[in-house]
């Protein structure tokens, strides 16, 4: 019986493609009589199978096509073939237009097909050709990646079955050259457009002869609009918003006839590329202000989101397992973390991390400068770091190593604290500075041009006492916090700025965080001691120590010279003990590019003074020794290699200091029984990231 076709105007939305019905296998009966209708069906099925095999589709797709789909695709293929035949004939009649060479006129068939397929796959959408009647003349095979419909499902189908009902009228207007289509009644021929014959005739002649579209009509033929299209991949609404961008061109070779039998001229059709409109989320719209999401740790691998990977042009394998020191650098007390990675072009891209202070576990876990910024300053950083010694910018050669004088200071019940006695013959850069001032470090003086020797004093620590969570008790008037040396940005060229201070109440102890923009350190610059986090250092005297002052054992080692110095912590979560013998003299190492403690001042000192001449080891952990040790000539250095060379140690015959590691059982730095509460150094100032694989030694005299 004949099937009733649903008119295109009343069609519902397109669903999934049809499946070929399974053929029932009936057992063959030898005595069965011949049936003429069955023979006719068998011949028809054989012809359809042969026609389906001629379609340019793989066998697995052809096996799923029903009879009507085979006929529809055959008609569509013949129409597309007729169109390209006419286009090739037009191009052959115009040899002077392009003037192709003999080699270009006959390209290899294999390379041409491969190039066309690759071009279609490189699009961010799919190619689409829609005739003036609303029939899908052609759709590329990549349509399945965006709408879920296979190419065989949409070829020679009504486009309005895939367009949202509210967007159908707008799509119909886009198919007309003047965006004013005539009213078409279904079942009746379209009315003759007598007013448009002259315009369409001129456009047709111009396109046939290759002279190009007249400039006065080019604006009418360009199309760019948005419609909602039926999508099987979207489970929320079933529609995907897509942008159609292209032009109206004549569709040749269709050979359509009027009801009177006259040949109709080619009509304008839409040749476009349909691409999905990606509406960015709120997080993606703030890409420029949120480039980095990371938790930097000195002993863990760097973590970065997809935005950082896109910025640095690096894949997941290049970032996996890479330690944090190679991905970012902390610019001392400023706390500005700069993610620094090498791009594909061989240049270094620097991405600043901007985030507020995150207080986790009672302490600042990540303190970042919201105003910090860093660009591609590779050449300028090399110029600044090359002048890292001396005021005049000339590189100075470090002098010989000399012992530093130590005197016994004030003792308490928890141990002895050594004091460094300055000498009158000290260099100007190592003389005691006024209270609250910053000592001029050699690396800072050479960094800035025309840097004066005298620096503006920083605010006194007493100015911030009101911002702490607990008052400072049992602190002498002559005890001050050692000021910190900063590394300002390149915009500060003439003098060290006066840093602003911000205090955070952490675990009841006051601490300072200098919010000052700093110079990001390049990965290859190994310029200072490693002062890391989360490990306590203790110094204990031997039980048979005779030269110890009052027989007291200090409970901890302090960095700096005053009684209110700051404890040093390390990230390996292991305690490090040193047990100096009475025969040995412990010397302080010069903090070449690290945090320098202030010289003691305002307190009477005893003992002879010696000239202070700093030395510059590659990596040194500078520990202050105990009091009461006799002054003697410096012994041979105890060289403990870094990671990977822990078994290599060089010890003199009379060397007595012993280094031990113990599991983490952090001692209380301050208890209620202690006489004073030490001011803790901010973690941002101690977290100076240095690659552990770099060659260098830890010098413990």
From Swiss-Prot:
It is found in: Cytoplasm; Nucleus. Residues 1-40, 366-434, 448-483 are annotated as: Disordered. Residues 112-182 form the PAS domain. One of its GO terms (biological process) is xenobiotic metabolic process. Coiled coil: none annotated. Induction: By 3-methylcholanthrene (3-MC) in MNCs from adults. By the heterodimer AHR/ARNT. GO terms for cellular component: aryl hydrocarbon receptor complex; chromatin; cytoplasm; nucleoplasm; nucleus. One of its GO terms (molecular function) is nuclear receptor activity. Keywords: Cytoplasm, DNA-binding, Isopeptide bond, Nucleus, Transcription, Transcription regulation, Ubl conjugation. Residues 551-701 are annotated as: Needed for transcriptional repression. There is a cross-link at residues 577, 660 (Glycyl lysine isopeptide (Lys-Gly) (interchain with G-Cter in SUMO2)). Gene3D superfamilies: Helix-loop-helix DNA-binding domain, PAS domain. Highly expressed in testis, lung, ovary, spleen and pancreas. Highly expressed in mononuclear cells (MNCs) from umbilical cord blood. Isoform 3 is highly expressed in lung, kidney, spleen and thymus. Down-regulated malignant tissue from different anatomical origins, including colon, breast, lung, stomach, cervix, and ovary. Residues 28-81 form the bHLH domain. Interacts with ANKRA2, HDAC4 and HDAC5. Interacts with ARNT; forms a heterodimer with ARNT. Mediates dioxin toxicity and is involved in regulation of cell growth and differentiation. Represses the transcription activity of AHR by competing with this transcription factor for heterodimer formation with the ARNT and subsequently binding to the xenobiotic response element (XRE) sequence present in the promoter regulatory region of variety of genes. Represses CYP1A1 by binding the XRE sequence and recruiting ANKRA2, HDAC4 and/or HDAC5. Autoregulates its expression by associating with its own XRE site. PANTHER family: ARYL HYDROCARBON RECEPTOR, ARYL HYDROCARBON RECEPTOR REPRESSOR. This is Aryl hydrocarbon receptor repressor. The lineage of its organism: Eukaryota, Metazoa, Chordata, Craniata, Vertebrata.
